């Protein structure tokens, strides 16, 4: 189970249902394949390094990647493919999760007049923290 699966399991994901996840894990092709969204997904992947660089410049924190799949030591079914890590001034490490969105989804990042992380992304960050045993996760959204 990867971090993006958590919001589908909790029923908070606007992108996939628990049934989609079930079919995905069994390698069963989904009846309604989301081919129309491939451009947005590809742009998100292409923009990740730029967004990480923006975060690094704005915060002054060192940002780096470890390209591997992390696995929880006690629960091997818990996996995490972390976008980036952040070296904080006190020497500790945090997670940096990169998100890209569009103008129509901007309201998902606000609640009661305050900037917030959507619950479906928050669950992803919490999953990453559980797998990596880190206690801080930054989200940077473009």
Where do the language-model regions lie?
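Charged, glycine-rich intrinsically disordered N-terminal tails and low-complexity linkers that flank
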Residues: 1-46
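A generic secondary-structure signal marking the coil-to-beta-strand transition
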Residues: 18-20, 51, 92-94
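Nucleic-acid nuclease catalytic cores
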Residues: 41, 57-82, 87-142
């Amino acid at each position: 189970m990867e971090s993006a699966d958590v919001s589908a399991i909790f029923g908070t994901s606007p992108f996939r249902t628990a049934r989609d996840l079930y079919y995905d894990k069994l390698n069963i092709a989904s009846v309604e394949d989301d081919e129309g969204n491939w451009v947005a997904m590809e742009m998100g992947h292409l923009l990740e390094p730029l967004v990480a660089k923006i975060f690094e410049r704005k915060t002054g924190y060192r940002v780096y990647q470890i390209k591997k799949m992390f696995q929880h030591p006690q629960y091997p079914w818990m996996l995490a493919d972390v976008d980036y890590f952040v070296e904080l001034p006190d020497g500790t490490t945090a997670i940096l999760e990169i998100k890209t969105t569009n103008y129509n989804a901007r309201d998902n990042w606000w609640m009661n007049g305050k900037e917030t992380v959507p619950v479906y992304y928050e669950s992803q960050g919490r999953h990453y923290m559980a797998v990596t045993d880190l206690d801080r996760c930054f989200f940077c959204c473009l």
